[in-house]
C-alpha cells in the first residue's frame, strides 16, 4: 500500500500532557483530538480514549510503562502530542518523553489542586528544558465554587514561579475533558480555548536544521524484507534518503550505514528534520549492532566521550531527591538523551561532600562512552529516581 506523503506546510510542534495521576491527562488528550476533529474534520482524525490509554507498552523493572503518540492540527500548526505515564516513582519515560517537548500542557484537577506528581513533573520539565507550559485546569464541571477554582489557579501559578517558569504570565485555561469528550458544547469550546492558548503561548521552536544531523536512538526493530529501523527524535540537522550516517556511542567502535528510508507517522518522507520523531531505515545494519543510548549522526561530526566536567544541581529531599549527602567516588547513573550510564564522580578540591539542594561542579568518568558536546544536559539518577540535573561544561577525554 502506498503511503501518504507528509505535507510540511505548517509549523510542527511537539507537545505533551504532564501532571498528577488521575487528573485527566489521557482524557484531555482524547478530548483535544475529538474537539479538533469536530471543528476541522479534514485535518484531524479522532483518537478515542481507549486507543491512547492502551499505548504501546514497555516493561521495565516489573512496571509497565507506555507513551502514546497522537497527531492533530489546529488552523495554524501541526502537533505531535505525547501522553506521558503517571507513576510518581518511575520517571524514566517521562524523561524521554519530556525531553521531546517544545512545550507541555500541565493538567491539574480543580477538584484536587497541585499534588506531588504535579510538582515533580514541573521540576522535571525545568530540568530537561521544556521551554513553555500552558495549564489546563481540568474537571471544572465538578467544582461549583468560583473562589475554590481561583484558589487552585493561584496555587498552580505559585508552583510554576517556584520552579522558574513565569507563573504570572502562563495561560491557565478552565476545562472539563470528560464532558468535552462526550460532546458537551460548552466544555468542547473550553478545549478549543486551551488549544488557542497553546497556539499562541508555546513558541514555534527554532529548529536546529542548520547544524549537522544527529538523532539519539530510542528504539530499534527489524522489518522483514526491508531491514533495520531506528526510531527517535532528530536532535539537530536534516537527514536525506541516500545519505551516509555514522552510528556511535556505548560501544568502542562506531559503524557507518546508508539511510534508505525516512518515515514519520507511517508516512514516507524524502528527509527528516530537527525536532521530528522519525524512523530511519538503514542498509546493512543488524538489529543487534544498535541499542538505545547510541546516536545516529553525520559522519565525523560528533565523538563519544567518557570523561567530562559538569555543573549540576542536586535535588533537595523535598523535591524527591536524596535524603543524605554524597561524597567523592559517588557512583550514580547519568541519564543522557535516552539512556542511563553509570559514572564515577570526582568532587572539586576542598569539597568534601554535596548536600541535597546544593549546586556543585564535578568531574565524571562514565563506564561507557556517550556522544556529547559541551552544553549537553543530563539527569543524575539512582535506581530510576532523579536525584540531580546537570550540563556538560567541558569534555576532558
Curated annotation (Swiss-Prot):
The record's function comment reads: GTP hydrolase that promotes the GTP-dependent binding of aminoacyl-tRNA to the A-site of ribosomes during protein biosynthesis.
Q: Which SUPFAM superfamilies does the entry mention? A: EF-Tu/eEF-1alpha/eIF2-gamma C-terminal domain, P-loop containing nucleoside triphosphate hydrolases, Translation proteins
**Domain spans labelled tr-type G:** 10-206
Record-stated family: Belongs to the TRAFAC class translation factor GTPase superfamily. Classic translation factor GTPase family. EF-Tu/EF-1A subfamily.
Descriptive protein name: Elongation factor Tu
Task: Write out the GO cellular component annotations.
Answer: cytosol
- Binding-site positions, GTP: 19-26, 83-87, 138-141
Query: Where are the annotated segments for G4?
Result: 138-141
Q: Residue ranges of region G1?
A: 19-26
Q: Which Enzyme Commission numbers does its entry carry?
A: 3.6.5.3
**Sequence positions that bind Mg(2+):** 26
Subunit structure, per the record? Monomer.
Query: Keywords of this protein's UniProt record, alphabetized?
Result: Cytoplasm, Elongation factor, GTP-binding, Hydrolase, Magnesium, Metal-binding, Nucleotide-binding, Protein biosynthesis
Catalytic EC class: hydrolase
Checking PANTHER family in the record gives:
ELONGATION FACTOR TU, MITOCHONDRIAL, ELONGATION FACTOR TU-RELATED
The GO terms describing molecular function are:
GTP binding; GTPase activity; translation elongation factor activity
> What InterPro entries would the database entry show?
EF-Tu_GTP-bd (IPR041709), EF-Tu_GTPase (IPR050055), EFTu-like_2 (IPR004161), EFTU_2 (IPR033720), G_TR_CS (IPR031157), P-loop_NTPase (IPR027417), Small_GTP-bd (IPR005225), T_Tr_GTP-bd_dom (IPR000795)
Query: Where is this protein found?
Result: Cytoplasm
What taxonomic ancestry is recorded? Answer: Bacteria, Bacillati, Actinomycetota, Actinomycetes, Propionibacteriales
Cited Pfam families: GTP_EFTU, GTP_EFTU_D2, GTP_EFTU_D3
Q: Which organism is it from?
A: Nocardioides sp. (strain ATCC BAA-499 / JS614)
What's its catalytic activity? GTP + H2O = GDP + phosphate + H(+)
